[in-house]
Amino acid sequence: YYFEDFKIESTFSEDSTRIIEINSPDIITGYMKGKFKVRELGRLVRNSIGSIYTNYKPFEISGGQEMSFNFKIYNKIVEVFFPQIDFGPNTFIRGNIIADEGDFKLNFKSPYISAYGNELDSIDFRIDNKNPLFNTYLTVQDVSTRYYDVKDFNLINTTLNDTLFFRTEFKGGSDYDDSYNLNFYHTFNPGNKSVIGLKKSDISFKGNTWVINRESNSQNKVIVNSTLDSITIEEIVMNNNNREQIRLKGQLADSTYKDLELQFKIVSLNKITPAIDSLNLKGEINGTLNVLQKDNIYLPVCNLDISQFSVNDIELGDLTIGVVGNRDLSEFSVNSQIK
């Protein structure tokens, strides 16, 4: 990579305010100014971000430090470190830190970000740890991925005691007919593992509303260890009306172990299958899907009963499906029967 100009200038004003100006039209332009020590700058920033958590233990730094910053980020510098990420023009980050008061404000905006085959348009991310209404706020106008598209994504967060509470809303699907209203939280348990819990939320898919954690209990959560290589899904439960239920639970450990179970209870087939032209599937599903992996050995098992099974309104009867895969998932034994 070739950069035409790169200039960094550090000066002090009459009141001992440090001013660091960076000017490179290919990399980054802007400034940071305030009363801060360069050797403590990393710890100062980490303390500011960590202040969102009330149980964060800050690094020791000198008192009286404060800083404001405003930078315009150009795509070439992003390409150097992350070749698969592309920032749009007029991407900027600005904010200020007052360390002694624990005050941290940040605003990041970009017209678009392309990353690993995914496209995000009109990103606006804000942090204000002293705001009584929200601590973090994120909006994304459009998200395009290879698997699912999203628009009007909004996420807001506030902190209570040692827990971050989030509310997010967005629409998804090929025609954006699916809607999501999710409430969740993040905290740490006594073992210093991350806990991501789902509070009562709802998802509308194919015109049907599913309620997550209808009972508002504390069991709907995922626990992640500090090295991010062990995940425990205690349970995630979705209900439609009073009868239908989908339940997920299991464990994952790096790439060598998985034990996942997906349960269906009186679930209408047409509510969970993707829309396919000229194909209309109906019936009620009961049963489980299991995937067990130990090292490179897999033991997938599926046992499903679909009552009143029909295709394009042609009733076929009650369908029973049993599937067992071999150890490397190269072959599957399928046993099905219609009565």
Question: Across the structure, where does each feature detected by a protein language model lie?
Answer:
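Interface amphipathic segments
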Residues: 1-339
